[in-house]
Swiss-Prot record:
GO terms for biological process: translation. One of its GO terms (cellular component) is cytosolic large ribosomal subunit. Part of the 50S ribosomal subunit. Binds 23S rRNA and is also seen to make contacts with the A and possibly P site tRNAs. The gene is rplP. This is Large ribosomal subunit protein uL16. Keywords: Ribonucleoprotein, Ribosomal protein, RNA-binding, rRNA-binding, tRNA-binding. Transmembrane segments: none annotated. Belongs to the universal ribosomal protein uL16 family. It comes from the Bacteria. GO terms for molecular function: rRNA binding; structural constituent of ribosome; tRNA binding. It holds the Pfam family Ribosomal_L16.
Amino acid sequence: MLQPKRTKHRKMFRIRHDKKDAFKGNKVSFGEYGLQATTSAWITARQIESARIAATRRMGREGQVIIRIFPHLSKTSKPIGVRMGSGKGSPEKWYSVVKRQTMMFEVSGIKPEVAKDALRLAGHKLPVKWRIVEASPKEEVI
């Protein structure tokens, strides 16, 4: 599963995923089709891995899945049955904040029908509403 190799601080503040749109990482950059979030949420490392496995199984040996989000924030929790106080709990899971219009996954090198089906299967594993976006034709600079 995805998690940072090392971080400056083990325990972090909780970041809001408010109703603002993403102004970076909201276009198809590396592939031909992309899975774009239409709502905001926290997405855990397990959910990202589950979506990646679903997409790669549908694609078979051809094509490539590009993950555009990374779970770099830690979520802490205390064990069950522990009373309040005595500090913050230990890091339990890693998550990523996904705002509206964030491009989460991209695929390249396969037929359009297979690409859309693979992204659809991956999207059903995630806790956000999503849509499939096609890459805009690149303009050649002369």
